[in-house]
Amino acid sequence: MKKILMVIAAVAVLQTVAYAQSIDFSGDVTGGKSVEVTNLENGYYDLTAVCKNASEEGVSYLYGVSDGYTAASTVLPVSADGVKVTVRGIEVENGKCTIGVGTDGNGVIEVSDVDLVKTDKQNGFIQGGDMTEVDYIESLGGEYKDNDGNKVDPFEFLSQNGMNMARIRLSNTPGKGTGDGVYYLPSGFQDEEDCLKLAKRAKDAGMGIQFTFNYSDYWSNGSRQIIPSEWVKQIKDELGYDVKNADFLNSMTSEQREEIQDKLAEIVYNYTYDIMSKLKAQGTVPEYVSLGNEIRGGMLFPFGNTYDASMNRDRFELVFGDDKNADEDIKCPKDWEGLVKFINAGYDAVKAVSEDSKVIIHLDDGSKSNKFTYFFDELDKLGAKYDVIGASYYPAWTDNNAEACKEFCNEISKKYDKDIMIMETGFNWNETRKDGYAGQLKDSDVYKDIYPPTMTGHKNFMAELFNELKSVDDNRCLGVLYWDPCMIHVEDKYNKNASLSGWAVKESDDKTDVNVVENTTLFDFDGKAIPSVDVYKHSSSSKEEVNIQTTSDEKNVKTRIENNTDSTKKVSVIVIGYDENNVINGVQNVSKEVNANTAEIVSVNLPQGKSAVYVWNGSRLIKK
């Protein structure tokens, strides 16, 4: 058991609360210690405290909880000297809140300098992950398991353990012949049908959705943005230009270039609008939409590049360093105006379907401010439209720690007055893949002597990262999405330690290449959840003990009922129909008993015409 010394030196809130005392929580404790704060105004609060936690065993967490709601909490980073811990999103009713520390390990925790601050809104925190590969992994026979080795649905399991946002990446037409000439993405996955299905799984599990348009048939990043094959065909059919022909690209006139850019912008709008409309029709409107993936180099090369570059004619990838084939390469002139055309077309399409969806522009190399200021200064100068700045942050590639990432978020959010989301992060829990070879993330020098590539090292890195991002000034960091939590090793029974899952398929022999992230996922080589899942579980925002989420399409309303209590709850979904004169013409009442700490989905058919949906959650009636 952990020994907890909790010194409540002062509890300061924006309203004046007469509360200041020192409490010595010493001796063995079971499950932690807490204190109740009273005489509070109802509303939302953030909690901070300085915490010393020298033990790496298990997880310990600072929390705040009020009657009728689950706890908001943050896992304590390992720190012998003390670190400021931030808990966001505590919801208070009945004028009181219990604050405390929970633990499942051994050691000593000291807590001091506690502040409970009233806020004007619930400052929640997104702690999500990329779920795009789940259907692909399951098709290969991969299984996801809980901590005890029981098979689970990864969406439901991760949602129940604190993951609240699913990233889903859409590639246009994956399959043989649509990659870079050497590799391709497997057909039938990451395409429209698959991503719509993944979105439904995410919503049914109670997750929000961050939807990424790759605008490519293949992996896209800062050096590779290949125009989708169907768009290439459309441009050739409608304009007569072959935008995959290197000789044409190197000889086209400025008028031809502008004509193609305008057509691409039109295609971007129509494609984005169509996919967004299909998401809306099935009740899975994304909360956040990313236009492209890591587009620091631009989009739809060579028509939207951010700097002068060359692209090889075989793989359509930017060339860096000693270019031995410079005379044959495709020239990619800097063209910010073209990029902004594409961004604004995508933005307008998203907003035409869902005004509430926030549009993200996502770059790599998060924590390196100069790369972002160069990019967003140009976007703003040219009138690009976006709502949120997205950044990938990998310690192995940026060689910056989580504190530096926090300071980067502070600087960039203040300069551009935009919220920030960390779109990707990852860390090794094993030095190599299962076959003994290195994965794509090499251990970062910045954490070399702090967090080794072990399960414990991974857990401690995640705890530090979550806490640092929660402490970004004015809560302007929305949260963080992990890449990739679910692209797990799937054992090849004919080739020991090799994986059936891989990052891409070879054009030459149609064999899957290696899985470069299998030693960074949130499940181990056998598919079993790793300890870092507990960091998600104990780093959450408050929600109602019986939490209700509804989605609807044209024919029915689907209600997800999440019972976060230790007893069975009876919940009723009531649908009232109205005629054209607003007179009630029908009532449906569907009740469901939901067992303790589980979730159920209730589906009710919608009547023709107007309707209203109400939910009785066991204690109050809620209009949805």
State where each predicted segment sits.
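Extra-cytoplasmic beta-strand recognition segments
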Residues: F25-G27, K33-E56, V83-I90, D113-D115, ...
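Extracellular carbohydrate recognition and processing domains
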Residues: V29-G32, D67-N94, I109, V594-I601
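Short beta-strand-plus-loop segments that form exposed binding edges in beta-rich domains
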Residues: G100-G107
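Boundary/entry segment of secreted carbohydrate-active catalytic domains
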Residues: K121-F157
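Glycoside hydrolase catalytic-domain groove-lining segments
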Residues: P154-F155, S354-V359, G366-Y447, G457, ...
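Aromatic-rich peripheral "rim/lid" segments of glycoside hydrolase catalytic domains that contact
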Residues: D308-A309, L318-V319, E407, E411, ...
